[in-house]
Protein backbone atom coordinates (compact mmCIF):
# COMPACT_ATOMS: atom_id res chain seq x y z
CA UNK A 1 0.00 0.00 0.00
CA UNK A 2 1.33 3.37 -0.89
CA UNK A 3 2.09 5.65 1.96
CA UNK A 4 0.53 9.10 2.31
CA UNK A 5 3.92 10.70 1.95
CA UNK A 6 4.45 9.02 -1.41
CA UNK A 7 1.10 10.30 -2.62
CA UNK A 8 1.92 13.80 -1.48
CA UNK A 9 5.12 13.67 -3.52
CA UNK A 10 3.08 13.04 -6.66
CA UNK A 11 0.91 16.15 -6.12
CA UNK A 12 1.85 18.95 -8.60
CA UNK A 13 2.90 22.25 -7.18
CA UNK A 14 1.10 25.62 -7.49
CA UNK A 15 -2.43 24.21 -7.43
CA UNK A 16 -5.37 25.29 -5.28
CA UNK A 17 -7.04 23.08 -2.69
CA UNK A 18 -10.14 22.31 -4.80
CA UNK A 19 -8.12 20.89 -7.67
CA UNK A 20 -5.95 19.08 -5.14
CA UNK A 21 -8.98 17.37 -3.62
CA UNK A 22 -10.26 16.38 -7.05
CA UNK A 23 -6.90 14.99 -8.02
CA UNK A 24 -6.62 12.95 -4.83
CA UNK A 25 -10.14 11.62 -5.21
CA UNK A 26 -9.49 10.46 -8.77
CA UNK A 27 -6.28 8.72 -7.76
CA UNK A 28 -8.03 7.09 -4.84
CA UNK A 29 -10.71 5.75 -7.20
CA UNK A 30 -8.14 4.33 -9.59
CA UNK A 31 -6.24 2.67 -6.73
CA UNK A 32 -9.42 1.11 -5.33
CA UNK A 33 -10.12 -0.80 -8.57
CA UNK A 34 -6.93 -2.92 -8.32
CA UNK A 35 -6.89 -3.58 -4.52
CA UNK A 36 -9.28 -5.14 -2.09
CA UNK A 37 -11.97 -3.33 -0.23
CA UNK A 38 -9.81 -3.15 2.86
CA UNK A 39 -6.89 -1.54 1.14
CA UNK A 40 -9.26 0.84 -0.67
CA UNK A 41 -10.86 1.71 2.61
CA UNK A 42 -7.49 2.46 4.17
CA UNK A 43 -6.39 4.48 1.16
CA UNK A 44 -9.63 6.44 1.18
CA UNK A 45 -9.27 7.09 4.86
CA UNK A 46 -5.70 8.22 4.37
CA UNK A 47 -6.72 10.44 1.45
CA UNK A 48 -9.54 11.94 3.43
CA UNK A 49 -7.22 12.51 6.36
CA UNK A 50 -4.63 14.16 4.17
CA UNK A 51 -7.29 16.27 2.48
CA UNK A 52 -8.60 17.29 5.86
CA UNK A 53 -5.14 18.37 6.98
CA UNK A 54 -4.46 20.22 3.71
CA UNK A 55 -7.82 21.95 3.69
CA UNK A 56 -7.28 23.07 7.26
CA UNK A 57 -3.95 24.57 6.28
CA UNK A 58 -5.34 26.30 3.14
CA UNK A 59 -8.37 27.69 4.94
CA UNK A 60 -6.11 30.03 6.84
CA UNK A 61 -4.76 31.59 3.63
CA UNK A 62 -8.06 31.95 1.76
CA UNK A 63 -8.97 35.58 1.08
CA UNK A 64 -12.17 37.24 2.15
CA UNK A 65 -13.80 36.94 -1.27
CA UNK A 66 -13.43 33.15 -1.36
CA UNK A 67 -14.70 32.80 2.19
CA UNK A 68 -17.80 34.85 1.32
CA UNK A 69 -18.54 32.64 -1.65
CA UNK A 70 -18.43 29.45 0.42
CA UNK A 71 -21.38 29.32 2.83
CA UNK A 72 -19.60 26.82 5.09
CA UNK A 73 -16.02 25.66 5.42
CA UNK A 74 -14.96 22.62 3.45
CA UNK A 75 -13.91 20.75 6.60
CA UNK A 76 -17.55 20.13 7.44
CA UNK A 77 -17.94 17.92 4.37
CA UNK A 78 -14.69 15.95 4.62
CA UNK A 79 -14.90 14.69 8.18
CA UNK A 80 -13.79 11.06 8.40
CA UNK A 81 -16.47 8.46 8.93
CA UNK A 82 -16.39 4.81 9.89
CA UNK A 83 -18.62 3.65 7.04
CA UNK A 84 -17.22 3.44 3.53
CA UNK A 85 -20.32 4.55 1.65
CA UNK A 86 -21.11 7.60 3.76
CA UNK A 87 -17.51 8.81 3.62
CA UNK A 88 -17.42 8.38 -0.14
CA UNK A 89 -20.68 10.26 -0.64
CA UNK A 90 -19.59 13.12 1.60
CA UNK A 91 -16.34 13.36 -0.32
CA UNK A 92 -18.16 13.59 -3.68
CA UNK A 93 -20.60 16.20 -2.39
CA UNK A 94 -17.82 18.30 -0.94
CA UNK A 95 -15.81 18.23 -4.16
CA UNK A 96 -18.84 19.07 -6.30
CA UNK A 97 -19.93 21.93 -4.03
CA UNK A 98 -16.46 23.41 -3.86
CA UNK A 99 -15.98 23.14 -7.61
CA UNK A 100 -19.32 24.72 -8.48
CA UNK A 101 -19.00 27.60 -6.01
CA UNK A 102 -15.48 28.54 -7.11
CA UNK A 103 -15.04 31.15 -9.89
CA UNK A 104 -13.86 29.87 -13.25
CA UNK A 105 -10.13 30.05 -13.94
CA UNK A 106 -8.91 32.92 -16.13
CA UNK A 107 -8.99 32.27 -19.85
CA UNK A 108 -5.61 32.07 -21.51
CA UNK A 109 -5.63 31.94 -25.34
CA UNK A 110 -3.62 29.17 -26.92
CA UNK A 111 -2.06 31.48 -29.53
CA UNK A 112 -0.50 34.82 -28.78
CA UNK A 113 -2.17 37.98 -30.24
CA UNK A 114 -0.36 39.43 -33.22
CA UNK A 115 -0.62 43.20 -33.92
CA UNK A 116 -1.16 42.61 -37.63
CA UNK A 117 -4.27 40.51 -37.12
CA UNK A 118 -6.55 43.58 -36.68
CA UNK A 119 -5.21 45.18 -39.84
CA UNK A 120 -5.75 42.00 -41.81
CA UNK A 121 -9.31 41.66 -40.53
CA UNK A 122 -10.12 45.28 -41.46
CA UNK A 123 -8.66 44.80 -44.93
CA UNK A 124 -10.69 41.64 -45.42
CA UNK A 125 -13.86 43.43 -44.31
CA UNK A 126 -13.28 46.28 -46.77
CA UNK A 127 -12.67 43.84 -49.60
CA UNK A 128 -15.89 41.96 -48.92
CA UNK A 129 -17.86 45.21 -48.65
CA UNK A 130 -16.45 46.38 -52.00
CA UNK A 131 -17.37 43.11 -53.69
CA UNK A 132 -20.90 42.99 -52.27
CA UNK A 133 -22.22 46.23 -53.87
CA UNK A 134 -26.01 46.61 -54.03
CA UNK A 135 -27.46 46.00 -57.46
CA UNK A 136 -30.40 48.40 -56.99
CA UNK A 137 -29.29 51.54 -55.11
CA UNK A 138 -31.80 53.24 -52.88
CA UNK A 139 -33.55 56.24 -54.48
CA UNK A 140 -33.55 58.21 -51.25
CA UNK A 141 -29.82 57.69 -50.83
CA UNK A 142 -29.12 58.82 -54.40
CA UNK A 143 -31.33 61.90 -54.01
CA UNK A 144 -29.70 62.79 -50.73
CA UNK A 145 -26.25 62.47 -52.31
CA UNK A 146 -27.23 64.73 -55.24
CA UNK A 147 -28.71 67.30 -52.87
CA UNK A 148 -25.56 67.26 -50.79
CA UNK A 149 -23.38 67.81 -53.86
CA UNK A 150 -25.62 70.67 -55.05
CA UNK A 151 -25.55 72.34 -51.64
CA UNK A 152 -21.78 72.02 -51.50
CA UNK A 153 -21.46 73.64 -54.95
CA UNK A 154 -23.78 76.49 -53.94
CA UNK A 155 -21.78 77.02 -50.76
CA UNK A 156 -18.58 77.24 -52.79
CA UNK A 157 -20.13 79.84 -55.14
CA UNK A 158 -21.40 81.88 -52.20
CA UNK A 159 -17.96 81.79 -50.61
CA UNK A 160 -16.34 82.97 -53.87
CA UNK A 161 -18.85 85.84 -54.19
CA UNK A 162 -18.28 86.81 -50.57
CA UNK A 163 -14.54 86.85 -51.14
CA UNK A 164 -14.96 89.06 -54.23
CA UNK A 165 -17.21 91.52 -52.39
CA UNK A 166 -14.81 91.73 -49.46
CA UNK A 167 -11.91 92.36 -51.83
CA UNK A 168 -13.82 95.12 -53.65
CA UNK A 169 -14.82 96.73 -50.35
CA UNK A 170 -11.23 96.65 -49.17
CA UNK A 171 -10.00 98.23 -52.43
CA UNK A 172 -12.67 100.97 -52.18
CA UNK A 173 -11.72 101.61 -48.57
CA UNK A 174 -8.06 101.90 -49.51
CA UNK A 175 -8.81 104.29 -52.38
CA UNK A 176 -11.01 106.47 -50.13
CA UNK A 177 -8.34 106.58 -47.45
CA UNK A 178 -5.70 107.60 -49.98
CA UNK A 179 -7.90 110.37 -51.41
CA UNK A 180 -8.71 111.68 -47.95
CA UNK A 181 -5.05 111.78 -46.99
CA UNK A 182 -4.07 113.81 -50.09
CA UNK A 183 -4.45 117.62 -49.58
CA UNK A 184 -6.67 119.73 -51.78
CA UNK A 185 -5.02 121.43 -54.76
CA UNK A 186 -5.88 125.14 -54.33
CA UNK A 187 -3.26 126.52 -56.71
CA UNK A 188 -4.46 128.85 -59.48
CA UNK A 189 -4.00 127.30 -62.87
CA UNK A 190 -4.20 129.65 -65.91
CA UNK A 191 -6.62 128.41 -68.53
CA UNK A 192 -5.24 127.56 -71.91
CA UNK A 193 -6.07 129.65 -74.99
CA UNK A 194 -7.41 126.63 -76.82
CA UNK A 195 -10.16 125.98 -74.31
CA UNK A 196 -13.65 127.05 -75.43
CA UNK A 197 -14.38 128.84 -72.14
CA UNK A 198 -11.45 131.26 -72.54
CA UNK A 199 -12.32 132.48 -76.02
CA UNK A 200 -11.78 136.22 -76.56
CA UNK A 201 -14.67 136.47 -79.04
CA UNK A 202 -17.28 138.94 -77.76
CA UNK A 203 -20.53 138.65 -79.71
CA UNK A 204 -21.87 142.02 -80.96
CA UNK A 205 -25.32 143.20 -79.99
CA UNK A 206 -27.72 142.11 -82.71
CA UNK A 207 -29.71 144.66 -84.62
CA UNK A 208 -33.42 145.16 -84.29
CA UNK A 209 -34.32 142.71 -87.04
CA UNK A 210 -32.02 140.16 -88.61
CA UNK A 211 -32.59 139.39 -92.25
CA UNK A 212 -31.98 135.69 -92.81
CA UNK A 213 -32.64 135.83 -96.55
CA UNK A 214 -29.63 137.94 -97.57
CA UNK A 215 -26.93 135.72 -99.11
CA UNK A 216 -23.52 135.46 -97.54
CA UNK A 217 -20.70 137.49 -99.07
CA UNK A 218 -18.17 135.95 -101.49
CA UNK A 219 -20.72 133.50 -102.77
CA UNK A 220 -21.85 133.36 -106.36
CA UNK A 221 -25.56 132.63 -106.18
CA UNK A 222 -27.87 133.14 -109.15
CA UNK A 223 -31.50 133.68 -108.23
CA UNK A 224 -34.51 134.71 -110.24
CA UNK A 225 -36.38 138.02 -109.85
CA UNK A 226 -39.27 136.29 -108.13
CA UNK A 227 -37.03 134.99 -105.37
CA UNK A 228 -35.44 138.43 -104.92
CA UNK A 229 -38.81 140.19 -104.71
CA UNK A 230 -40.08 137.60 -102.26
CA UNK A 231 -37.03 138.08 -100.04
CA UNK A 232 -37.47 141.87 -100.05
CA UNK A 233 -41.17 141.63 -99.27
CA UNK A 234 -40.46 139.16 -96.45
CA UNK A 235 -37.95 141.59 -94.97
CA UNK A 236 -40.47 144.44 -95.03
CA UNK A 237 -43.11 142.18 -93.50
CA UNK A 238 -40.74 141.29 -90.66
CA UNK A 239 -40.06 144.98 -90.03
CA UNK A 240 -43.76 145.77 -90.02
CA UNK A 241 -44.50 142.87 -87.68
CA UNK A 242 -41.80 144.08 -85.34
CA UNK A 243 -43.28 147.55 -85.10
CA UNK A 244 -46.79 146.18 -84.65
CA UNK A 245 -45.59 144.19 -81.70
CA UNK A 246 -43.81 147.26 -80.33
CA UNK A 247 -46.93 149.43 -80.39
CA UNK A 248 -48.93 147.55 -77.73
CA UNK A 249 -51.60 150.28 -77.80
CA UNK A 250 -49.33 153.20 -76.80
CA UNK A 251 -48.73 154.88 -80.17
CA UNK A 252 -52.19 156.54 -80.61
CA UNK A 253 -51.82 158.34 -77.29
CA UNK A 254 -48.67 160.08 -78.50
CA UNK A 255 -50.26 161.33 -81.74
CA UNK A 256 -51.28 165.02 -81.87
CA UNK A 257 -55.05 165.07 -82.42
CA UNK A 258 -57.34 168.10 -82.26
CA UNK A 259 -58.88 168.08 -78.80
CA UNK A 260 -62.18 169.60 -79.97
CA UNK A 261 -62.64 167.03 -82.74
CA UNK A 262 -61.85 164.28 -80.29
CA UNK A 263 -64.52 165.51 -77.89
CA UNK A 264 -67.21 166.08 -80.52
CA UNK A 265 -66.62 163.01 -82.70
CA UNK A 266 -68.45 159.89 -81.48
CA UNK A 267 -66.54 156.70 -80.80
CA UNK A 268 -66.57 154.33 -83.70
CA UNK A 269 -65.07 151.05 -84.57
CA UNK A 270 -61.98 150.83 -86.69
CA UNK A 271 -63.17 150.06 -90.23
CA UNK A 272 -61.39 147.76 -92.60
CA UNK A 273 -59.05 149.26 -95.17
CA UNK A 274 -60.00 147.00 -98.03
CA UNK A 275 -62.71 149.18 -99.68
CA UNK A 276 -62.31 152.58 -101.37
CA UNK A 277 -65.06 154.17 -99.28
CA UNK A 278 -63.25 153.41 -96.04
CA UNK A 279 -60.08 154.93 -97.45
CA UNK A 280 -61.92 158.11 -98.55
CA UNK A 281 -63.69 158.44 -95.20
CA UNK A 282 -60.46 158.01 -93.30
CA UNK A 283 -58.74 160.59 -95.45
CA UNK A 284 -61.08 163.25 -94.02
CA UNK A 285 -60.49 162.18 -90.41
CA UNK A 286 -56.79 161.66 -90.72
CA UNK A 287 -54.27 162.13 -88.03
CA UNK A 288 -52.00 165.11 -87.74
CA UNK A 289 -49.71 165.76 -90.68
CA UNK A 290 -46.45 163.93 -90.81
CA UNK A 291 -43.61 166.01 -89.38
CA UNK A 292 -40.87 166.90 -91.83
CA UNK A 293 -38.09 164.42 -92.09
CA UNK A 294 -34.93 165.93 -90.71
CA UNK A 295 -31.39 164.82 -91.14
CA UNK A 296 -31.32 163.50 -87.59
CA UNK A 297 -34.10 160.97 -88.27
CA UNK A 298 -33.04 157.43 -87.48
CA UNK A 299 -33.26 154.77 -90.15
CA UNK A 300 -33.78 151.08 -89.72
CA UNK A 301 -30.79 149.07 -90.89
CA UNK A 302 -31.15 145.35 -91.30
CA UNK A 303 -27.78 143.57 -91.43
CA UNK A 304 -26.19 146.67 -92.97
CA UNK A 305 -28.54 146.33 -95.97
CA UNK A 306 -31.77 148.27 -96.41
CA UNK A 307 -34.03 148.42 -99.42
CA UNK A 308 -35.81 151.64 -98.35
CA UNK A 309 -33.81 154.17 -96.31
CA UNK A 310 -36.34 157.00 -96.58
CA UNK A 311 -38.59 155.65 -93.82
CA UNK A 312 -37.89 156.82 -90.32
CA UNK A 313 -38.81 155.12 -87.09
CA UNK A 314 -41.97 157.22 -86.84
CA UNK A 315 -42.95 156.26 -90.38
CA UNK A 316 -42.59 152.62 -89.52
CA UNK A 317 -44.81 153.02 -86.48
CA UNK A 318 -47.43 154.89 -88.56
CA UNK A 319 -47.31 152.18 -91.17
CA UNK A 320 -47.81 149.54 -88.51
CA UNK A 321 -50.73 151.50 -87.01
CA UNK A 322 -52.60 152.56 -90.17
CA UNK A 323 -51.81 149.62 -92.36
CA UNK A 324 -49.78 149.31 -95.49
CA UNK A 325 -52.44 150.52 -97.97
CA UNK A 326 -53.54 153.62 -96.08
CA UNK A 327 -49.97 154.59 -95.20
CA UNK A 328 -48.85 154.37 -98.84
CA UNK A 329 -51.90 156.37 -100.00
CA UNK A 330 -51.31 159.09 -97.41
CA UNK A 331 -47.64 159.24 -98.27
CA UNK A 332 -48.38 159.67 -101.99
CA UNK A 333 -50.96 162.39 -101.30
CA UNK A 334 -48.47 164.32 -99.17
CA UNK A 335 -45.90 164.24 -101.92
Swiss-Prot record:
| Annotated Low complexity bias | 222-234, 275-295
According to the lineage, what is the superkingdom?
Eukaryota
| Region of interest: Disordered | 153-174, 218-239, 254-295
Regions of compositional bias (Acidic residues) in chain numbering: 156-170
What is the protein name given in its UniProt record?
A: Uncharacterized protein R08C7.12
Organism per entry: Caenorhabditis elegans
Source taxonomy lineage? Eukaryota, Metazoa, Ecdysozoa, Nematoda, Chromadorea
Amino acid sequence: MASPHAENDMVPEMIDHRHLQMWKWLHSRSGARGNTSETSFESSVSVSTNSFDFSADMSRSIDSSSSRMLPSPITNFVTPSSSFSSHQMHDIYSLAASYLQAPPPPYTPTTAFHPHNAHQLLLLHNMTAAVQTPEDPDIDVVGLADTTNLVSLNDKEDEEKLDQTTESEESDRISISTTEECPLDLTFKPTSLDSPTSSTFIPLRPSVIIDHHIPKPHTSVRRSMSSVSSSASSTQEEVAAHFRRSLSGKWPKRCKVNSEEARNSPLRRRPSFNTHTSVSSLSVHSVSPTPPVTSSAQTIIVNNHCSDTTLSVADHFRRALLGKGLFDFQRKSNK
